Amino acid sequence: MINFDRKKYPIYASFLNQLAKDLTKFYNSKLNRTFKVSNKLKGKGYDPVTTSDRAFEKFIRSRIKKKFPTHQVIGEEYGSTNSKSDYTWVIDPIDGTRSYVIGNPTWSNLISLNFKGIPILGLANFPVLKKYYLNYSDKLAYVVSQGKKKKLSVNKKATFKNVKVSGAFHGWLSLNKQKKIPKIL
């Protein structure tokens, strides 16, 4: 068990709540118009990165640095900062860059706060959908959609009868293996 001071949850949760709102405003004011796409992979393969990925990450990093200047930050586009802090922010500025590029609204900004390597808070923000999810370790999770907050919980009576699975495997899971997914469930 880690010795994270749980009294600090409200500080970080408040920051992430505001950051989700700010990221949505940032997207709507600047990033939903035009962007450029390039390939991060040299040679074989294709891993797209957009100017929006980079802009989101810079925006997130600036907010973290302003509020928590001693914390370490690791981001997909700009790597890590050097810090001896027990706190590390992990950023995927656009999870689902391929969806972003084609205009599918299911991409998100993913941000995790880790304490001594253990995730303690996580944010999944969907700017186009005006929705975000926030979880506090394994204790509490909620969704904010269209400004309304709803606590999430595990359904103790869940069955797999009505489960739907969606994924984008982009070459790392063969079509043959993808066909076996329904059998697993």
PLM regions with names:
Residues 83-142:
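DPxDG-like acidic metal-binding loop motif
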Residues 153-185:
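An extended, acidic
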